[in-house]
């Protein structure tokens, strides 16, 4: 089949109400029913798919004859909120195709992560053993899990509860206990108690008593064990309460006890506790006499309350495993119901390194923690990058499209022709959508393009240069299927979704001739702008879990939005804290936050730009700030040299690297923002803002900074909860800060280094850091470093990155001469012409090549950190390099010292 779906071929099936009524083979009818409903259940739990049923009756028409009442009833039991939400039907010649949407629970119910026919988890309800529905099973599992987590001891009885509430139940229970103490019974003796929550009577009149006992015992044991325990009394009539027993000719007592023991010990259990005890039960055989002669036996099974949960058998719940409909085991079922991670050490999962995302059985994997934060911004991100207009289709991302269209003549026209007449949506390009979502790339593929438009299902175009570039036959199919799965799981798209794969050739300007048309039911077409936007928001989440140019562009915008939120929160301190020392750890984007505060000061105090002063150490940062925000910006040296009578508010950045050589800048700043009264009684001195931003881990010199001692830096605000970079980069910074705490550098202050705490920083990484890249190479010559940088840059340009995304930084100004010429020579061998700019031209189009000090306060998506010394002699520079990178960090070291 041409569908990019998990497909179940059922073989021949009798369909239609009249045809199924006429079936004389009841076993075959039940088999067809169960096979079909199990396949539906498996696909529901495995991301959806297609069931292909070969129609037995060649005159059958789905439109005229329908499915058959027994099949419809089974689907209704499986999907009580309405099977039409998940199932669609389409007849193709002599095949009926059932399109199954991925399982999504009813919004008003508990969040059931999987669908089940029966839980086979029983509880006692007065005189009945109830096979719990999915909601009831989930409630019981959560209750037992919570009790185990609290360390509540296992209760062997609940006398203290029953005595207060249901005395009758306790009386019956005590009668059953007394009954158990008897040695013999009389035939047709009437018992003084009845069935209850704790007592079940059973009488079997069949010839084969032992098989019937084994048949029914499991669900009664499960029910009593999962409730409060109880007694199964076999050989007593449940209506008359008379003792009949099991005739001695039909039952061997010892054999019966063995069968019961084997049956109970085989029952599947799931433990939340550490002790993991077995089901505790007692079996007693009572002799029944008729006129002093042995007539038979009554069997009593006493079941104790169980600490966790006991199942009668594995749940009737199914998944697709290796394209086979497979029944879930208890362990799998409980873990999926409760969203329990099998491997809690997985850390920071991404698409590219999470192989479990490929497993259909785990079609709803745990989302990475950072997506929780992204969910708050997905709509804004979608509108920023994928704005859906009624004009022409938009091709995104722009940088990659520009590269592709300039390198391959006719590609843009080919895609416009293929996507016609769609005009209300987006076409999203990638060098390899397969690589983006964790599959193997195909070298012969020129690019992939995903159409998301009103009036069309999703279509994935794979563009090859010509028919001879066949590549792997299953490339497009697998990519389309995996993309669909991740839009459902990571993207959380709730609607019916398909991705139709198509291969097209650039040379012939057309599709592959052997591709059959692919049809889906109408609900799989995106019918409105709202549906397109919902799906694009899901695509935002999927992209942010990958590593691609689109992911990086989305990630940088996401960090900007988080930074804006953080600035809004921090600005609430403006009124109450006119002076504030803000300690920011690496990765928290200190300078960007300081710049945001300038805008907030203008908004809060309604002051003019000329009344706000931004003070920093370097000319390059000063120039950058002046391009970002409207205010006065000066270096510390200029601040000490000039007077600023009109300034009311001062924001100072990088104060950890200020110095007092030109005077006491702190005293001057304080006297500027908090001038003393001139003696007039009716004059009130102005109290402006003086906020000082510093990073205690990035002190670059041993001279005194001029800051007050740490104990005098009050009031103080710690910025540690937001990490605005890739998780791989954040890990480098975390390790360096930990190392510096353990071995403080000569210019650091142990008191301020103590602000770093590993656990909260890791929590911030999990909550906000996105996937990225960090590579470290050592023992390289300058030429090897230059070649590595050039190859990596041209590879990135091929993927759609731009020169202005990149900064190449070295440790000291004097290192520039060592690297510039070899870098220019190496870069000249590539196809993209690039220019190197200094940090002073950070807003120009070109690669930044400058010292890490001159680039202070600024960031780039991609940073190369060059160090001629060995990795062990680099001091705090690894931290400085890392703090300048957002998504990619490449640390390249010379020297001969190995790791």
UniProtKB/Swiss-Prot annotation:
SUPFAM superfamilies: P-loop containing nucleoside triphosphate hydrolases
GO BP, sorted A to Z: cellular response to magnesium ion; cellular response to manganese ion; mRNA catabolic process; platelet maturation; rRNA catabolic process
Primary enzyme class: hydrolase
A matching Pfam family: SLFN_GTPase-like
Region named Required for endoribonuclease activity: 195-382
Top-level taxonomic group: Eukaryota
Cofactor(s) needed by this chain: Mg(2+); Mn(2+)
Nuclease keyword on record: yes
Keyword Nucleus belongs to the record: yes
A GO term from the CC aspect: cytoplasm
A single GO molecular function term of this UniProt record: ribosome binding
Tissue expression profile of the protein: Expressed in spleen.
Stretches the record annotates as Required for ribosome binding: 383-562
Keyword list, A-Z: Endonuclease, Hydrolase, Nuclease, Nucleus
EC number from the UniProt entry: 3.1.-.-
Cofactor binding: number and manner: C-terminally truncated SLFN14 endoribonuclease: Requires manganese and magnesium for its endoribonuclease activity.
Xref: PANTHER family: PROTEIN SLFN14 (PTHR12155:SF30), SCHLAFEN (PTHR12155)
Protein name: Protein SLFN14
Organism this protein belongs to: Mus musculus
Annotated gene: Slfn14
